[in-house]
């Protein structure tokens, strides 16, 4: 059997941060001051988002997980330092625990104006913070096949990322309420199966032809073949509280892609499960995080979510050494033992009864371990 090259499984990581008022712990519309100052240092690696209380950063194309860690850590430290100079805080959580979207300003930009004009309150209320991970692909044809199979694992990784238990001052009962907010948008959630890249491209062409979208970036699925880069883009996760959690999740997505690629080169295929079944597990991940159970479709039974995540680690264990990501993958055990960002937010609230204390905890952990 020919040796498999893993070099094309590059990584790109995008994070969305909340901008905070240190005095009130509320979200703070900052008129893009952080972005303007950031672009003097890190150029286009920092960008404005639709709401002024959001800052988006993105890494370079990283050859491996070590590079991604260094890049994300540098971005977090840079943005945090700029914010501090402006008497602001930054933090990483899928939703803000108590700020209301109505009081936040929209960034003046043609693209955002178009989205708000079309989607109205669904867009204005979309005050959420996510993590996007790009994994490099050999070809677009391979990308669509890997995306089809990788859909099954989205709930597992989503459960590890859950970090948004509060919304507008209330405990939602969910470990991740962020996706419940985002579901108001069209073209979100688990994507359909596409038998080929041509089938996907034809779908995009139809939407453009019928004036639904102007380009494929307005397809906001939990996973998509990126319209401009040769990557599979994973978009399901909440922004994790810490850098270590972000890179652990990125390493898992990379390992899943590498394993599915390895199977395909051996003329083996992972089972393609229907979207409606994967959605069942996604809802469970949103509601319970790692504390609940998911459906094992093969056994047709409920299985503890932690057990399924351990099975995922076994599934990718043969490719992880080739990717050099063992250290980061091993952090999954710590998350499973100590809880996700949502679990930690809820613990602080139970101990203090104070949502501002939760925000302070989020801010204090933004640079944890760096």
What kind of feature is each model-predicted range?
Residues 22, 88, 93-98, 131, ...:
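An acidic- and aromatic-residue-enriched active-site/binding cleft used to recognize and process polar
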């Amino acid at each position: 059997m020919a040796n498999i090259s893993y070099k094309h499984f590059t990584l790109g990581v995008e994070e969305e941060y909340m901008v905070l008022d240190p005095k009130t712990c509320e979200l703070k519309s900052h008129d893009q001051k952080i972005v303007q100052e950031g672009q003097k240092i890190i150029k286009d690696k920092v960008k404005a988002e639709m709401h002024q209380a959001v800052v988006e950063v993105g890494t370079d194309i990283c050859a491996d997980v070590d590079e991604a860690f260094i890049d994300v850590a540098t971005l977090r430290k840079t943005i945090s330092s700029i914010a501090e100079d402006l008497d602001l805080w930054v933090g990483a959580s899928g939703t803000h625990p108590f700020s209301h979207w109505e009081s936040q300003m929209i960034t003046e930009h043609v693209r955002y104006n178009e989205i708000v004009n079309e989607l109205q309150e669904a867009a204005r209320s979309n005050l959420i913070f996510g993590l996007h991970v790009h994994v490099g692909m050999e070809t677009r044809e391979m990308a669509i096949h890997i995306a089809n199979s990788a859909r099954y694992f989205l709930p597992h990784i989503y459960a590890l990322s859950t970090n948004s238990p509060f919304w507008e001052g209330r405990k939602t009962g969910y470990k991740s309420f962020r996706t419940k907010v985002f579901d108001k948008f069209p073209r979100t959630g688990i994507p359909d199966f596409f038998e080929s890249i041509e089938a996907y491209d034809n779908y995009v062409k139809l939407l453009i032809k019928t004036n639904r979208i102007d380009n494929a970036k307005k397809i906001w699925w939990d996973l998509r073949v990126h319209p401009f880069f040769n990557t599979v883009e994973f978009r399901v996760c909440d922004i994790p509280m810490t850098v270590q959690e972000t890179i652990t999740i990125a390493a898992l997505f990379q390992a899943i892609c590498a394993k599915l690629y390895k199977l395909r080169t051996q003329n083996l295929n992972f089972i393609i499960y229907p979207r409606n079944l994967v959605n069942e597990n996604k809802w469970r991940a949103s509601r319970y995080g790692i504390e609940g159970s998911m459906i094992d479709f093969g056994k047709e039974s409920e299985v503890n979510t932690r057990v399924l995540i351990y099975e995922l680690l076994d599934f990718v264990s043969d490719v992880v050494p080739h990717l050099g990501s063992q250290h980061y993958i091993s952090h999954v055990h710590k998350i499973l033992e100590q809880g996700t960002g949502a679990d930690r937010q809820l613990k602080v609230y139970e101990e203090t009864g104070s949502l501002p204390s939760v925000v302070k905890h989020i801010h204090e952990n933004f640079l944890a371990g760096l």
